[in-house]
């Protein structure tokens, strides 16, 4: 089923080529030299086609649109009449970051289209003790929390199970349009339930090359998609009345950029979301750290996903979500959120009584002091109320993240979109050539 260039693949040299059989026709390979073409084999690579756009030292996982594009590419190749007799080999090179993302895509394909379990997909990929470096967050500096390929595969499997992921109804054009800074910088984390988006400003403008959007930019889109509730987590950069006057509920839950929320904020956020009539749109400054953290709390409570699985899923939907200490915070909150979710579902089933409530309260009081991975829950005292001034002076994590996203998308646009001057020059040249042909050359040819 699998093969390596070594006689004993379990002790392979890191520089040896590895081939892994996914199906009888599809293979995944790590190659340290360019493969030679053959009549019965089709090689292809996506290393320079589907590329992660990093904020800092982060390098993956690739986003949902890229997973979709990859799966479509594989299905098309497997169904191609010209390749029916060929083996299809997806190969990656020596770059460990590219290897991890390539393996991520192959594993997602196995889970989504081949019905493999996350564990089975992972076992196939790690044949020969093939090492894959884990994914890290988008924060600046050192990292002490990672998500693995297996975490990602579990996230994708559970997303399918709970209806978050359905490529039969996935709208690629909409995803890629609205994720761009100039088009709103928003992503659905749970379809029809949660949107994460960049914080609006008092007026729409282009500031230092970055598109700042007013609340009005989002209003029609939100109405078209049954968004009823807006939750702001950063300082006030627009008047909430501009949303409420348009018929939306608006809530402010401030906490500092790059920090973790208090228990009171988490509880209030969950209460708002659980009572919202429609979808909820959540933002902080960049719509990454604080936004991802609170949406992750909801997912962990209501779907019993682990912290690592949840972080993996929200980053697949919107790269960069959940930053620095927010990762360990979610690990610490996992058990208590699961218990809260169990009680919530129990209550919905009409099984609540005084004994249930008393027992649940006792459980939660014990969970407050539980140590997970050697980290004690020390959120016993409420910190001082968050002040807007905390984000006014100096450059925050959100500022840096937005600036990076704007710069990289500007570079992409520079490559993909010709300048107005180039278009005008091309048009004028075409007119001149056509005039010469019609006025001089064509009469000679005809007569």
UniProtKB/Swiss-Prot annotation:
This is Dual specificity protein phosphatase CDC14C. GO terms for cellular component: cytoplasm; endoplasmic reticulum membrane; mitotic spindle; nucleolus; spindle pole. May act as an autosomal functional substitute. It is an enzyme of class 3 (hydrolase). PROSITE patterns: TYR_PHOSPHATASE_1, TYR_PHOSPHATASE_2, TYR_PHOSPHATASE_DUAL. It catalyses: O-phospho-L-tyrosyl-[protein] + H2O = L-tyrosyl-[protein] + phosphate; O-phospho-L-seryl-[protein] + H2O = L-seryl-[protein] + phosphate; O-phospho-L-threonyl-[protein] + H2O = L-threonyl-[protein] + phosphate. It is a single-pass membrane protein. It is found in: Endoplasmic reticulum membrane. Dual-specificity phosphatase. Preferentially dephosphorylates proteins modified by proline-directed kinases. The gene is CDC14C. Residues 183-349 are annotated as: B. It holds the Pfam family DSPn.
